[in-house]
Regions:
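Active-site recognition of the HExxH zinc-binding catalytic motif
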Residues: 2, 18-31, 91
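Short coil/turn linking the two alpha-helices of tandem helical-hairpin repeats
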Residues: 242, 274-278
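Secretory-pathway/luminal and periplasmic proteins that interact with or process carbohydrate-rich
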Residues: 27-28, 56-62, 118-125
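Extracytoplasmic and endomembrane cell-envelope/extracellular-matrix remodeling and assembly machinery
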Residues: 74, 78-79, 84-263, 286-289
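Acidic/histidine metal-binding catalytic segments
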Residues: 37-40, 44, 66-68, 103-113
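Membrane-active amphipathic alpha-helices enriched in small hydrophobic residues
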Residues: 44-59, 67-79
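Catalytic Zn2+-binding segment of zinc metalloproteases
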Residues: 14, 24-41, 59
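Short pre-active-site segment immediately N-terminal to the catalytic Zn-binding motif
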Residues: 1-18, 83-86
C-alpha cells in the first residue's frame, strides 16, 4: 500500500497519517484477501469474451468479434472497479473512525485526496467513472468534508516531531532518487536545517565527494549522536566507499538504538560478511536471523 512515490507526494505528515489510516481500513476490512477473488472474476470474464470473440472471428464476423472482446474486457474491468470502489469507501469510513478514535484530524487525508484529484489527466466531466482506477474522488472528499464539519479534532495539529520526521524522510528520498544537481538546488548550502544537511550528505556521497559527505554527517551526529538513521547513513557512506570495517561501528551503534529495525540489522550483517573476517560471521548470522 505504501511506497516512495506516495511518501514523496505527501506534503506533510498529516497526509501520510491520513493515508496510513485509510490503508489500515483496507487491512481491517480483509480487502487484501478479497481483491484476488475480484481479479480472478474480472479475468475470467475477459478470457471468456476473448474465446467467444475468437470464435466469431473464425466465422468471418470480425466486427462482432472485436465488439465481444472489447465488451468482455470492459465488463471484467467494471466488475473489478466496482469491487474496488466498495473497498475504498469502506476504507475511508474506517479511516475516519480510526482518526477520530485517536484524536487526530482527517484534514491530511482530505488534502491528499485533493492532490490525487489534481493529478487527473482528464477533466471530470469527460471521465468514464468505470474506467477510473480510483473511486470518484469528489464523492469521497464530500464524505470527508462532512466528517470534518462534525469532528472535534478537525483543527488538531500534527505533532511537530512527526512533521520533522516527514521532512527528513522526504529529503533523504529526494536525494537518493533525484539527480544530485536537483538536490543541491532544492537544499541549498545556505539551508542549515537538519533535513537539508541530510539531503546534501546523500548528494555528496552520490557525487563521490566523500570528505564533504562525511563532514556533513559528522556535524549531524555531533548534534544527534544517538539518531539511528544518521548512524546508519554514516555507515552506508563508509561501506559504499570501500571502507567496510569503518562502517561497522556505526551500523552497530544504529542497531543498539533501533534493535527492531530489520533494514539496519541487514546492513550490519552485510558489512560483517564483507569483511571476510570469520570472527564476525556468527554475529552476522545472528543479525540476519533477528532481521
Amino acid at each position: 500500500f505504501m511506497n516512495t512515490g506516495l511518501l514523496m507526494e505527501a506534503k506533510n505528515a498529516g497526509q501520510v497519517i491520513g493515508v496510513i489510516a485509510h490503508e489500515t481500513g483496507h487491512i481491517a476490512g480483509g480487502h487484501l484477501s478479497r481483491i484476488q477473488a475480484a481479479l480472478d472474476k474480472s479475468s475470467a470474464q475477459s478470457i471468456a469474451a476473448f474465446i467467444l470473440g475468437g470464435a466469431a472471428a473464425v466465422l468471418g464476423q470480425g466486427d462482432l468479434a472485436q465488439a465481444i472482446i472489447i465488451g468482455g474486457q470492459t465488463l471484467g474491468t467494471n466488475s473489478f472497479l466496482r469491487f474496488t470502489r466498495t473497498q475504498e469507501n469502506s476504507a475511508d469510513q474506517a479511516a475516519m473512525r480510526l482518526l477520530e478514535g485517536t484524536h487526530q484530524s482527517a484534514q491530511g487525508l482530505y488534502e491528499f485526496m485533493a492532490i490525487l484529484e489534481e493529478q487527473e489527466l482528464v477533466s471530470p466531466q469527460y471521465q468514464d467513472a468505470y474506467m477510473r482506477t480510483h473511486p470518484v474522488t469528489r464523492s469521497r472528499m464530500t464524505a470527508l468534508r462532512a466528517h470534518m464539519a462534525n469532528s472535534a479534532y478537525s483543527r488538531t495539529p500534527v505533532a511537530p516531531e512527526l512533521q520533522a520526521i516527514h521532512r527528513r524522510l522526504r529529503a533523504k528520498l529526494y536525494a537518493f532518487l533525484e539527480p544530485t544537481s536537483r538536490t543541491m538546488r532544492r537544499y541549498k548550502k545556505s539551508d542549515r536545517s537538519i533535513e537539508a544537511r541530510y539531503a546534501r550528505a546523500v548528494a555528496y556521497h552520490k557525487s563521490a565527494k566523500l570528505d564533504k559527505a562525511l563532514k556533513t554527517m559528522s556535524g549531524l551526529l555531533t548534534e544527534h549522536p544517538k539518531d539511528p538513521y544518521f548512524l546508519e547513513l554514516m555507515g552506508q557512506i563508509l561501506f559504499e566507499s570501500g571502507r567496510v570495517r569503518d562502517s561497522i561501528p556505526y551500523y552497530t551503534a544504529a542497531v543498539k538504538v533501533a534493535p527492531s529495525s530489520a533494514l539496519i540489522r541487514g546492513e550490519l550483517a552485510h558489512a560483517q560478511i564483507e569483511t571476510n573476517n570469520p570472527a564476525l560471521l556468527q554475529s552476522a548470522i545472528s543479525n540476519l536471523r533477528a532481521a
